[in-house]
Amino acid sequence: MLTVTDLSIRTKQTKETLVRSVSFSVKSGEALGLIGESGSGKSMTSKCIMRLLNPRLFDLRGSVKWNGKEMLAVKLNELDGYRGKQISMIPQNPMTAFAPMLKLGKQMELGFPLKGRRERTQFRGRLAAALADVNLPDAEKIINSYPHELSGGTLQRVMIA
């Protein structure tokens, strides 16, 4: 469960408050969409939850708890078991999340150390099933595409898979 309590984000340089006293919780199995006007702090809040804000540039106040653990106090080198495995974020512009010169299948393989043809084949099977789960049934086409060949919505679904 994710619990955000009285979260405020301020720049250290200009002292500008970017997010003021945001609180919400999300239970296991629930999805959350942050919606609001441009500049209202949606992306900053998401980046804070994912610990993607440079602590030298921002003052963070409040609490971000994941399953009871205070995430703002966790050391950055301990976040590997958290980001992507337990909690994820889909950016507004998915084009910025992919390397433009690599096919999507290759980029997805980079996250998993695959040894040999057998593991690669098994991975491709799991990947095809995950893509089908997000209504992308033509896995071979997706795997062999470059990011610029697909729509933003399709790329967002690839990220979810």
Predicted regions, residues:
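Conserved structural motif at the start of ABC-family nucleotide-binding domains
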Residues: 2-4, 19-21, 82
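The feature captures the beta-strand-to-loop junction immediately N-terminal to the Walker
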Residues: 35-37
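Conserved ABC transporter NBD signature motif
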Residues: 58-70
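Conserved ABC ATPase "signature" region
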Residues: 70, 121-141
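Q-loop/switch helix immediately C-terminal to the Walker
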Residues: 93, 100-114, 126
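Conserved ABC ATPase signature
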Residues: 145-150, 154
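Hydrophobic anchor residue at the start of the ABC signature
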Residues: 160
